[in-house]
Amino acid sequence: MAVEKTNASSSLVEVIDRILDKGVCIDAWARVSLVGIELLAIEARVVVASVDTFLKYAEAVGLTTTATAMHA
């Protein structure tokens, strides 16, 4: 995947449109510990994309066939 670089500024609408078109995956992990004792651990995976983009990539990796087989 090539990264496109432009010098022009983008409006918020253009940025949101691009995120929904391409999709964004955010993987975050945090741990809070005190004196070597883990107090809190947070793991999050967030995917932001349009339904059309999700279905296109889900079909490419075979996720849609599993869902169809479950409902049949």
From Swiss-Prot:
Protein's UniProt keywords contain Lyase: no
Keyword set includes Lipid biosynthesis: no
Domain of life from the UniProt record: Bacteria
Predominant cellular place of this UniProt entry's protein: other
Record keywords, A-Z: Gas vesicle
GO molecular function, one term: structural molecule activity
Subcellular locations according to the entry: Gas vesicle shell
GO terms under cellular component: gas vesicle shell; vesicle membrane
InterPro entries given in the database record: Gas-vesicle_GvpA-like, Gas_vesicle_GvpA, GvpA, GvpA-like_CS
NCBIfam families per UniProt: PRK09371.1
Functional summary from the UniProt entry: Gas vesicles are hollow, gas filled proteinaceous nanostructures found in some microorganisms. During planktonic growth they allow positioning of the organism at a favorable depth for light or nutrient acquisition. GvpA forms the protein shell.
Subunit structure comment from the entry: The gas vesicle shell is 2 nm thick and consists of a single layer of this protein. It forms helical ribs nearly perpendicular to the long axis of the vesicle.
Classification via HAMAP family: Gas_vesicle_A
Family: Belongs to the gas vesicle GvpA family.
Protein name, as recorded: Gas vesicle protein A
Gene name, Swiss-Prot/TrEMBL: gvpA
